[in-house]
Amino acid sequence: MSYFAEKLAELAQVGLNRSLPEIEHQGKWIIAQNRKMLNFSSNDYLGLASDTELQQTFLQNILQEAPLHQWFSSSSSRLLTGNFPIYARLEQLLAQRFQRETALLFNSGYHANIGILPALVDKHSLILADKLVHASLIDGTRLAGCDFYRYQHNNLAHLTQLLEKHTGQYRRIIIVTESVFSMDGDVAPLPQLVALKKAFSSQTEVMLYVDEAHAIGVYGANGLGMAEFFDCIDDIDLLVGTFGKALASMGAYLICDQLIKQYLVNTMRPLIFSTALAPINVAWTHFLFEKLPQFQPKRAHLARLSQQLKQAVELRNGDTLATQSCIVPFVVGENRQAVEKSQYLQQQGYYCLPIRPPTVPKGTARIRFSLTADLTEAELNGLIACL
């Protein structure tokens, strides 16, 4: 046991020790250490998680559909007895909205990302992943067991070099990226990635895998993410997103062709061997996803707040890493500086958290401001005054 104590002491010495926070939620407020603070660290981008009117309407609706006891647990894998009708209804709604053949649900974004890639590749496959993709995609790539390279972040020239070098050597190449990057807030050049995929597909099957976890609900005319914004939904082979952020629910989805879905149902271990989401979670997601186009005013307000905060940080000579989203990083550099800045902002009434290595590269510790549509301009100005 002394080994673990030593390792924890080493983490504490360099400002990397972590602990689970004791917090309470009151809408857009966080209560911690007897202090009430505005939440600037949530992924509840549209502010739906605290919308009690929506919640009450939803609960009234589901009680009319089925008895209460049928909603709380699936009690099984979907391939056994856990496949309730609401799953198919949500998958059909997703396929209809994205105008693609089909969709497949998962328990979480992490669950999706560690399962899809290992199921679809073999020793004749190559994965080319952006250097800054989420930890779940890195883990999925490692679990896949095939050859992989990580191209420089959003660097199309480097990706092109790798494609030129390896096309023809593998049966299948999968390009992997996020659309909105979770820590930097910048955006992948999806149209150019689609063009590269098409350009190299004559010699080798090239597929494009895009994780829209931080884009779904927030971007696009109907809230369908950056793929909708860039009008390239049809060109993305594996379009993944989550429900636990802007959609204030739980779970994840894949938009794909029917053949891919059927193959995953037969081969994806995290899907086959996991108890399915509770039906009430899936029903809540369906309820909100139906309303997604109606939330355009929330998206517009969020975009204005995001631009305002980005400009304010840059005016104070802060590095925002070219963010183009509602994730606004304020890079301070060293771990302890980030922790101290976070503590100061919390003392002023703003719940802002430090992000440190290994979540981000060494020397880029930061405050990661995550904005939500239920924040007001006056509340944002209060934060800006403390920067």
Swiss-Prot record:
Binding residue positions for pyridoxal 5'-phosphate: G109, Y110, S182, H214, T242
UniProt GO BP: biotin biosynthetic process
EC numbers: 2.3.1.47
Catalytic activity: 6-carboxyhexanoyl-[ACP] + L-alanine + H(+) = (8S)-8-amino-7-oxononanoate + holo-[ACP] + CO2
Entry keyword annotation includes Transferase: yes
Record keyword Nuclease present: no
Gene Ontology molecular function terms on file: 8-amino-7-oxononanoate synthase activity; pyridoxal phosphate binding
Alphabetized UniProt keyword annotations: Acyltransferase, Biotin biosynthesis, Pyridoxal phosphate, Transferase
Pathway recorded for this protein: Cofactor biosynthesis; biotin biosynthesis
Xref: SUPFAM superfamilies: PLP-dependent transferases (SSF53383)
Residues noted as binding substrate in the record, renumbered to the chain: H134, T359
Modified-residue entries (N6-(pyridoxal phosphate)lysine), positions: K245
PROSITE patterns membership: AA_TRANSFER_CLASS_2 (PS00599)
InterPro entries: Aminotrans_II_pyridoxalP_BS, Aminotransferase_I/II_large, AON_synthase_class-II, PyrdxlP-dep_Trfase, PyrdxlP-dep_Trfase_major, PyrdxlP-dep_Trfase_small
Domain of life according to the entry: Bacteria
Cofactor: pyridoxal 5'-phosphate
Function noted in UniProt: Catalyzes the decarboxylative condensation of pimeloyl-[acyl-carrier protein] and L-alanine to produce 8-amino-7-oxononanoate (AON), [acyl-carrier protein], and carbon dioxide.
Family indicated by similarity: Belongs to the class-II pyridoxal-phosphate-dependent aminotransferase family. BioF subfamily.
Subunit structure: Homodimer.
Name used for this protein in its record: 8-amino-7-oxononanoate synthase
Organism: Haemophilus ducreyi (strain 35000HP / ATCC 700724)
Lineage per the UniProt record: Bacteria, Pseudomonadati, Pseudomonadota, Gammaproteobacteria, Pasteurellales
Gene designation per UniProt: bioF
